[in-house]
Amino acid sequence: MKRHPGLAPLSREHHHGLVMAERLVLGRSTNPRADWPADRAEQSARLIDFFQTNLGPHFDAEEAHVFPVAARDVTDGDRLVRALIDDHEAMREMVSALAAGEAGPAARADLDGRLRAFGERLRRHIRIEERELFERMQAECSPETLREIETRLTEHEAAGGPSCRL
């Protein structure tokens, strides 16, 4: 999948999101040298930090600079964008619940399931953005429009937007 430079920064960030998703689904890292905790509570803390420093700002950038263009210029883009925004909201709520320390016995017992569910949702969401949204945008948006997205994302990053790290 060759990405237009206007969408490439988001695709690079998506890679980091997919790594996080895999770790949450599996409950471990597939890289034996990775500094990834075995304890699910520590993994939850890592997810919360990753969300606050990377994924949340990434969602904000997509919602501000990419989704309005897709809704306007892509066939059936408004429906696709609405579904992606709904996903963003659901993931924000999931992380908020983890951060709020919903720590009753049932919540603690189901931490594994909640982290796995978040990872599965994030993975599915990224795949839709990469395979549907970005592909349609590259096919249907003008080169000028994609360059404008690139400019806006560059400005967003310069203003302190996400720079993904695990």
Predicted regions and their residues:
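Small-residue-biased structural context
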Residues: 1-166
